[in-house]
Amino acid sequence: SSVSDELPADTIMITEGSAGNLAWSEWLAQHPATPPAANVASEDAFLQLYTSGTTGNPKGVVSTHSNFLALSVMNSTASPQRADAGTSGVICAPLFHIGGAGSLVFGVFSGMETLLHRAFDPAVVVEDIEQHHVCNIFMVPAMIMAVLQLPDIEMRDFSKLSQVFYGASPISETVLRRAVEVFQCDFIQMYGMTETTG
């Protein structure tokens, strides 16, 4: 039995085209190019995220449209660097909690090109930063440490990277100093909870 057999009948399952399921492109082709009109209230559910599970099992958190609008406005006005249609960002944090989801919504809100990674791979992250002239990224300290441990890290081009957002766990002064030395950009410590949308 597959996961799709367990889902309610009114559930649409979109995959990369495995047997019996629609590929995203096929599903999209079945619908009009213009989105349907919708009346959305600010307190309507926008996204269900999950807590990190720091104090127990992860818990579901329903965030509203106004939660994410406020987060996006705050991020775009508090950020010392611009983010718009002429910039790029990388998302390598999981999308089930605020670190990844907040970065994704910020990218959509600001209009910047957003590169989504299925999983964190430090070498691929660095390649994307170079090739796509990435200006900002969110990483937890463990990710920053993994990037810094790449053998050729000092030879890589981070000239377009203007800010690294980090959080979710403490970072040592040694790691932070090394990261600033290598990336040569602003580091912005984030603190928030999924329950408060950041």
Report each predicted region and the residues it spans.
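Short hydrophobic/charged patches on amphipathic alpha-helices used for structural packing
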Residues: A37, A123-V126, M145, I153-M155
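Conserved AMP-binding/adenylation subdomain of ANL enzymes
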Residues: L69-S88, F96-N136, L150
